[in-house]
Amino acid sequence: MSETLAIYGGTPAVDVTKVVNWPPVDKTDEKMVLDALYAQVQTYGKHNMAFGEEFAKWNGNQYALFTNSGTAALHMCLVGCGIGAGDHVLVTAYSWSSSATCILHHDAIPIFVDIDPETFLMDPDKIEEAITPRTKAIIVVQLHGLCNDMDKINAIARKHGLKVIEDACQAHGALYKGRKAGTLGDCAAFSFNQNKCLSCGEGGMFVTNDEEIYKGGAKLWSFGEIARPDERRDYHAYALGWMYRNNELTAAFGRAQLSKYDFYFNTLRDNGEYLLKNLAGTPDLLLPYEPEYATHNWYNFNLRIDFDKMHITDPEEQIAFRDAVAAALRDEGIRASVWQRFILPEMTVFAAKNAYGMGYPWSIPGADEGVDYSLEKFPNALAYSRKHISIVQTLRAPNGLDIAEQVRQGISKVFNNLDKIDPERIRKILEDRMK
């Protein structure tokens, strides 16, 4: 293998012609989707019902409702837990925007909590100091497919009378002390979009073991109506509702993919463990951390650059160097990306405190008391946003250890040549490609 970086003209480490795209589709998917295609019912049909039932059984939930997105499922969780206008909800400072915009959907206020620098998850030791008199719930984001310390978080929630909502949108099959994500709080949301470990293109799942939470959240699913999917509709809006239903084709694809998910999960586990073992000791590379209590699903395998050892302290220099390293990894044939460049309090929708105009919902009398989005409160989240690189999809099934080894070679090649990474040169190379 050439040690000249591929971005400078060397041979890529990964033979991308051997990498199977995600999600893999076979006859099982074709048969299920064609069955839905030729059915006379495209909504409220058998596949929607069956997907919810099969997912609930697989994951260990009593109730599950298939939605059109993970964001929709998160909104349903909040409503099911009785969150309303002016309430406060704790959430990590680093995640996808939906983890916090879902709070705004029902006129509540996000209260951000900094992350643990090793797990990248909300720091449980910072939760209590963030609780305000208006706090009603904690959204625990099982980010990148890793579960947080749920015993500690649930104990805090019980002490303060708070609901616990799992954002498990990336955590299909991830475990906490042997229990699956989505069963560790009062309710949970999953996502099935293109990038997820379990994908049907787009979609989500609202799950809970609490009948009252299910009934409350389900009102949003279909225009505020209360009929279950298997019951006759009366077309009466009993509450403010959205249109969060999904269709039969997507549900059928989801069912087929779920039937293969244990294989997908085990493949990801094997590939992730292989990289952890065989990249140990790579210079200036910080590998992801898996606590003893957790079983990661490796939705994202996150690399971090050890800027402390490299003596790069300026944030802008860190970002430019990280972006150049990510570009070099991509040219080696690795699907590497910067998953989220901004921490949530940095995003305009939160920083401006003006979601709906006239400062709403922060302008609700008393709602903004104790709400501080100053970026200096979130040093760990800021630091992480500047130095991480995510590997997505390349490690997914059916790609096995042969591909994982090529990925390892590509990562080793780039990190053993960090002295040759010239951010300005790489920026110009990328610009020239766009011409």
PLM region spans:
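PLP-dependent enzyme catalytic core of the Aspartate aminotransferase-like
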Residues: 1, 352-435
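Phosphate-binding glycine-rich loop
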Residues: 41-88, 102-104, 112-114, 179
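Active-site region of PLP-dependent enzymes
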Residues: 171-177, 184-303
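PLP-dependent aminotransferase-like
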Residues: 79, 83-168, 175
